Amino acid sequence: MRILTVLLTVFATATFAQGKPNVLLIMADDLRDFGGAFTKEVVKTPNLDRLRARSTTFERAYVQYPVCNPSRSSLLTGLRAEQTGIVGNDKPLRQKLPDIVTLPQLCKEAGWQSHAFGKIYHLGGGNDVEARQRWVDAGRSWHSAQDFDATKEGRRMLAGRDITSGALKWCVWGAADGTDDDQPDGQIAAATVAKIQELGDKPWFIGCGFMKPHDPFIAPKKYFDLYPIDTLKPWRDPAETMPVRKESVGFGEYGKAFGKFTPQEWLELFRAYCAATSYMDAQLGRVLDALDKQGLWDKTIVIFVGDHGYHTGERQWWNKNTLFERSCRAPLIIAAPGMKGGQTTRSLTE
């Protein structure tokens, strides 16, 4: 199936029936689909469940490339990685394809108010404001684009640990002080809600790009409290499972560090990933509440998608970057006016 066929078919159908619908593209960073250690019985995502009740859930949605920038570039252009030439996180889309028309750009040029909050395109550029604007494609894809940082209070950890003693700088967890809005995803949700309220009846395309559960696995402490560590069990691969091969990206550095994890460290990191997921889910709920309050479900297409999957210890791996199911399969949930909710499909989706 061609990439984005499902999304654009839904989009075109709703446009034909009702004029310009609103489009809410919600992206989650490093959010895996269910399976392995990460099951519906373990992780608490009431707002994803709430969205699924209104939507079609695609259970076999596969990304083009299991790394953030290549996957997002493919999603937003409709091109595979061999066509975009983007196979890493080091180059912005326009450096490779200066004249490509992206999905939000298409909507912007067709009359939608187009705004982005958080991570829709990969957020490169470091602390250089102009570089970051180029990375998020401000001006071309969006009327406005904004990203966010944790506050001083949100950077204060009430508990936490560097699991690999510095070997992998990203492999840390932290139960943070402060409120949801002291972390970026809370600010992203608040800004998205404010923009929805501000735009009123104008047709809009809003990208709401949550940054969790991507590492570092930090969330307000109350989300860690949802997962008492003594209620979790370490994952054990079936005996016939093949581990990630040494030829995999970063295996030497990563594999050595992962191989030293004790069962307790595995539980700590898994708990933190679940906590970050539940934190993101709570922010999703705030955005869904805005659609409820504004009465927008009958004129809004909602697309929730992950940029790729993630291993949480399966095959002795804690990352993406592989071609295994856990890394290549991503969440995809679509709600649209006139679509029956609570449906699932196992049709292959790119």
Predicted regions and their residues:
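Hydrophobic h-region of N-terminal signal peptides that target proteins for export
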Residues: 8-17
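Sec-dependent signal peptide recognition
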Residues: 1-9
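Formylglycine-dependent sulfatase
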Residues: 2-3, 16-350
